[in-house]
Amino acid sequence: EICREIFNIIDYTTLINLTDIEPLQYSEYGVDDEYGWHRDVHDEPYYNGLVRKVSFSTILNTDFEGGEFDIETNNPTDKKRYQTFKTGKYNTIIFPAHMWHRVRPVKSGVRKSIVGWLLGRP
């Protein structure tokens, strides 16, 4: 349901042409787990001839430390060059799939999240 809601909001408020939703992915990060800098786009269409246009991540719990979500800002005047998000339970981060992002190492507990991708024609 959250997927469809995000799809509708982006479809109606932006010029991004969305046509489908990729299956959701459930993730758990334990102590010292992380996901390094990466982008969610592929070089060629791969899912029914579509590409990832929009990514989102929803945190499912708060009983963990660390595991912050960073997105590169592409701002050359910003020394840090990324923005850090430490979200609350069920908060969702939505961003263009071509942006570099990462999950920092979890220090304690287990970070649980659902991630998904909204798709469109290349």
Where are these regions (language model features)?
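Fe(II)/2-oxoglutarate oxygenase catalytic core
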Residues: 1-94, 98-122
